[in-house]
Amino acid sequence: MNILVSGATGFIGSHTCVSLLEEGHNVIAFDNFFNSKENVIEHIKELSGRDFVFYNADMTNQDDMEKIFSENQIDCVIHFAGYKAVGESVQIPLSYYHNNIYGTLCLLNVMKSHNVKKIIFSSSATVYGNPASLPIKEDFPLS
């Protein structure tokens, strides 16, 4: 399967890329390095023993998204490219709205125009607050 991973050089994104590559999937990945480093790309290749397609791209840039989808046959998107720092989100909410909402809409619009109908969206454990016990179960109430 050809899988696009957004936020690919972040902690969860990079580990997901390694797992997907080890399982034999073709990975197309992008990140804007807002909260990660470029050298993670080489670490993913070293750990998985495989190469993959990478774009230095921002999901809020419609042209970046169009380029990625035009140059690749994508079957599914795994979406990790969201800002997640709760304290910062309260201090600069418009930046979070722009990236997390507008950026996701840009991604979804390009997916629609290229007939890509499968997406896995990763949220954050911060939606649960401070649970009294771990692990958190599926029916745990949100904060």
Question: What residue ranges belong to the model's regions?
Answer:
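N-terminal Rossmann-like NAD(P)+-binding domain of SDR-like oxidoreductases, especially those catalyzing
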Residues: 1-143
